[in-house]
Swiss-Prot record:
GO terms under cellular component: large ribosomal subunit
Swiss-Prot/TrEMBL keywords: Repressor, Ribonucleoprotein, Ribosomal protein, RNA-binding, rRNA-binding, Translation regulation, tRNA-binding
Pfam families reported in the protein's UniProt record: Ribosomal_L1
Assembly: Part of the 50S ribosomal subunit.
Protein name as it appears in the record: Large ribosomal subunit protein uL1
Superkingdom of source: Bacteria
Entry's Gene Ontology BP terms: regulation of translation; translation
Gene that encodes it: rplA
Cited InterPro entries: Ribosom_uL1_bac-type (IPR005878), Ribosomal_uL1 (IPR002143), Ribosomal_uL1-like (IPR023674), Ribosomal_uL1/biogenesis (IPR028364), Ribosomal_uL1_3-a/b-sand (IPR016095), Ribosomal_uL1_CS (IPR023673)
SUPFAM superfamilies in alphabetical order: Ribosomal protein L1 (SSF56808)
The species this protein was found in: Thermosipho melanesiensis (strain DSM 12029 / CIP 104789 / BI429)
Cytoplasm keyword on record: no
CDD domains on file: Ribosomal_L1
One MF annotation (Gene Ontology) recorded for this entry: structural constituent of ribosome
């Protein structure tokens, strides 16, 4: 079992691991335990009642936060001609077609956070599935990253729209801002993310959809949150 740092052990004492905090308390506590020398990311972890073995119960979609995540998002676009120009004007960091696919495949280029493609590019990037898929970077219509409206997609992802997907245990891990954010902005982001997740409940899920909610910072302990206080 890995040893935690002295700093981690000190801040962990501030959190009652047996208690479910209301959202207001949890945000205060998250900001208080974020004592690292960098601006820690605040993450919302949601444990669902999804049966990941059933394909119709998996969540893969996009959400947007009213105040963004505080992270500069690097966007790569696979497009040609007019669509490539639209992507560049919209602020894409990298735009190309076969050249980009080759750079990824042969040079291991992965210096981006989101990959968007026009539908006609899928035959070119299909061979990149084994590289981009495991990293959650493969363009996908469900995630809004395969589209002809590349300009709108680039702007949305630059503003903070992000893809979310359940992991193999049915959990969601969502960055909701930085510890330096004002409390009100963090709270609004958390509530917005949670409400959007509720709207993504697969029809096949029986009983309670959300089993547990935890808030944490990059280097801090988990803080259990009472789900009822996320919709008040």
């Amino acid at each position: 079992m890995p040893k935690h740092s002295k700093r981690y052990n000190e801040v962990r004492k501030l959190v009652d691991r047996t208690k479910e905090y209301d959202l207001n308390e949890a945000v205060d506590l998250a900001k208080k335990v974020a004592t690292a020398k960098f601006d820690e990311t605040v993450e919302l972890h949601i444990k669902t009642n999804i049966d990941y073995r059933k394909s119709d119960q998996q969540i893969r979609s996009t959400i947007s936060l009213p105040h963004g995540t505080g992270k500069e998002v690097r966007v790569l676009v696979f497009a040609k001609g007019e669509k490539a120009e639209e992507a560049k004007k919209a602020g894409a960091d990298y735009v190309g077609a076969e050249d980009l696919a080759e750079k990824i495949q042969k040079e291991g280029f992965l210096d981006f956070d989101v990959a968007i493609a026009t539908p006609d590019m899928m035959k070119i990037i299909g061979r990149l599935g084994k590289i981009l898929g495991p990293r959650g970077l493969m363009p996908n219509p469900k995630a809004g990253t395969v589209t002809n409206d590349v300009a709108a997609a680039v702007k949305d992802f630059k503003k903070g729209r992000m893809e979310i997907r359940t992991d193999k245990t049915g959990n969601l891990h969502i960055p909701v801002g930085k510890a330096s954010f004002e409390k009100e902005k963090l709270t609004e982001n958390i509530k917005s993310a949670y409400e959007q997740v509720l709207n993504l409940k697969p029809t096949g899920v029986k009983g309670t959809f959300i089993k547990k909610v935890v808030l944490s910072t990059t280097m801090g302990p988990g803080i259990k949150v009472n789900p009822a206080t996320l919709t008040q």
